[in-house]
Amino acid sequence: FLVLTVGMAVNGGAGAMAPVAIGAALMVMVYAGGHISGGHYNPAVTLAVLIRGRITAAEAVPYMVAQVVAATTAAFAVKYLIGDDKMPAEAVANGDAVKALLAEVLGTFALAYVVLNVATAKANAGNSYFGLAIGLTVTTMAYALGSISGGAFNPAVAVGVSFMKMAAWGDI
């Protein structure tokens, strides 16, 4: 649902409110799926949780595969719903791939930092705010860095937006 929300909000005319819709969608997804899968929707965050030792490699790999497959499927759904002719031309925001990569690394780091400290820290066991913190982090980073990189902060989303022609394959 995350890539579906990204594609529909950005291409469907949400304008400046798109990051709010995307952050809210992620928050809802974390609350809805957190008790089932740990709320793993981002391969970079899954890797961070693996490094922290909260999941095993045998758990992480299927999550990562599912994340990319789901993002790709959602991208094709968006293309069908909106129409290929209404999808944007391939581009990196501001045309500077190095700056875009740095922005993505920083935004992804911020997201992983928040996830590790609100959703996997022993001191926060049983908290009920982690979805809000995670969703607001994505919203904040999208507003702060989105004009530089497009604001994916998630390798699976980056694959999805490439299929939707919102970013060029060579810039992932």
Which positions does each model-derived feature cover?
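Membrane-interface helix-loop junctions and terminal tails of multi-pass membrane proteins
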Residues: 1-172
